[in-house]
């Protein structure tokens, strides 16, 4: 009930897009991302193979057979580079030392937009009081902006034994991979979810006014705040998001078989019976000339929804420019 017209418009449009994507032919987002695999291999699991190579082969075949966009650019020198034409290399991290006979996987397709909205801030203990931390978060929430396609799944990690550990924690938390962490610390220095600060950050995001791309309340779906141990002289803080496409899935291989997380296959059940009631968008005919278009636009605030018709010249960004190389 508190959603703005723009919030409603974005939510409804995204649900319609999900219904199309659920048919398995067109992806939710044309940026089908860097393929990331985070795996934990039980100490009793023996494959007799180059696991990373096998996973990379699966990435290659999937992107080729499903006609997904190739986004990886490979360098030949510091200056010269070209699209790999396969979406390889993938990021594959395999960890061992876990007891048992299970091979667990988290697969993420991370688009450039959400990856670019990953930030590391090197802070100190001076940040660790309610007033300073609240001010810091209010300030840096605006670093996210809207170019990574909100509503976001927002993750914040405060602390970490290293900068890379802090950043890795944020990536996993934004995918919901750390949801089962404990909710309090201990003398052993375990990481934990701070549920109180998750509520505080959620409130900050809703009151920011940024909204779901065009102003409003729903900048984020949800928030994960992870507190981690740190070196006494350091306090890394990482902020990152999973975008509205939110493409991640868990899997595991056990002696009983192969198991894949079941995702929603019928998003249409979330659609309202009727489109949400919204104020009409402003109609603009681009063929009437830029002077007239500008005169119309100056009458309306930023965040006004527009219906454009006429000749539209599209400037392709650098990611798309590399695809045909």
Predicted regions and their residues:
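Non-transmembrane, aqueous-exposed alpha-helical and coiled segments at domain scale
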Residues: 1-156, 161-277
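Cofactor-/ligand-binding subdomain signature composed of acidic, glycine-rich
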Residues: 276, 282, 302
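Short, structured beta-strand/loop micro-motifs enriched in basic residues and often containing a Trp
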Residues: 280-292
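Short, well-ordered loop/turn sites that connect or cap secondary structure elements
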Residues: 299-300, 306
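Short, charged beta-turn/beta-strand-edge "cap" motif at the junction between a beta-strand
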Residues: 305, 311-315
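Short, compositionally biased
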Residues: 314-325
């Amino acid at each position: 009930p508190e959603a703005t017209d723009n919030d409603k418009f974005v939510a409804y449009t995204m649900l319609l897009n999900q219904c199309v994507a659920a048919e398995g032919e067109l992806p939710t987002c044309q940026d089908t991302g860097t393929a990331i695999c985070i795996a934990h291999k039980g100490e009793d699991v023996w494959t007799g193979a180059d696991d990373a190579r096998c996973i990379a082969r699966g990435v290659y075949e999937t992107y080729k057979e499903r006609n997904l966009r190739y986004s990886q650019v490979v360098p030949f020198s510091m200056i010269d580079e070209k699209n790999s034409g396969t979406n390889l290399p993938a990021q594959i991290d395999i960890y061992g030392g876990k007891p048992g006979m299970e091979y667990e996987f988290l697969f993420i397709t991370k688009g450039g937009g959400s990856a670019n909205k990953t930030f590391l801030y090197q802070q100190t203990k001076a940040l660790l009081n309610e007033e300073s931390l609240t001010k810091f978060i209010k300030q840096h929430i605006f670093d996210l902006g809207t170019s990574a396609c909100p509503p976001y799944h927002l993750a914040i990690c405060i602390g970490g034994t290293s900068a890379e550990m802090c950043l890795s924690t944020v990536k996993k938390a934004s995918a919901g991979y750390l949801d089962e962490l404990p909710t309090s610390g201990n003398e052993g220095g375990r990481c934990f979810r701070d549920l109180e600060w998750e509520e505080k950050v959620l409130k900050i995001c809703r009151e920011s006014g940024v909204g779901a791309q065009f102003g409003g309340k729903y900048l984020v779906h949800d928030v994960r705040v992870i507190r981690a141990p740190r070196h006494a002289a350091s306090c890394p803080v990482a902020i990152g998001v999973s975008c509205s496409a939110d493409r991640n899935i868990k899997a595991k291989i056990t002696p009983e078989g192969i198991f894949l997380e079941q995702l929603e296959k019928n998003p249409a059940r979330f659609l309202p019976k009727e489109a949400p009631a919204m104020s009409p968008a402003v109609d603009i005919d681009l063929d009437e000339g830029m002077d007239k278009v500008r005169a119309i636009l100056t009458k309306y605030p930023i965040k006004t929804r527009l219906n454009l018709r006429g000749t539209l010249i599209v400037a392709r960004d650098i990611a798309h420019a590399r695809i045909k190389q």
